[in-house]
Amino acid sequence: MPELLKERVETCYQQAETFFKRPFPRPEVSFKLRGQKAGVAHLHENLLRFNLQLYRENQEDFLRQTVAHEVAHLVAHQLFGDSIQAHGEEWQLIMRGVYELPPNRCHNYEVQRRATTRYIYRCPCPQGDFPFTAQRHKLVRQGRRYLCKRCRAILVYSGETRVE
């Protein structure tokens, strides 16, 4: 686990403990998060998950804003219980009062989309190319058939692929 992030989680908890004058249990920290989310707080498991790729690409802002954002969710839940809204007044109070940060709901990190392979199927129609996903291509190989909506012919794999 990146040490700077672990240290920032601890710093956020120390700030919350000083502000609220009470201790908070420390969460488990995981980097098993992919896709568009920078972080997720699992309230009942006392677990923080962070996106390692987004952390590496946006380290300074991630440490300052994202870590505090997720810790604030756990602190708010431990202080106010289940009945609060995720980005409601209580969470905003913690972001502004404890961490002196804007209570931004979402990050604006650039997220690289994964390249996907499309399998090109054809029919006799003009503009008769149909890009299939890997899952649909596998179903065809297992015997499923797909028809062109215009000419009702069975779509046939052309042997071509395209990366998008």
From Swiss-Prot:
Binding positions (Zn(2+)): H69, H73
Major localisation: cytoplasm
Pfam families documented for this protein: SprT-like
Single Gene Ontology BP annotation: response to stress
Molecular functions (GO terms): zinc ion binding
Family designation: Belongs to the SprT family.
Protein name, per record: Protein SprT
Organism: Pseudomonas putida (strain GB-1)
Organism classification: Bacteria, Pseudomonadati, Pseudomonadota, Gammaproteobacteria, Pseudomonadales
Gene name per UniProt: sprT
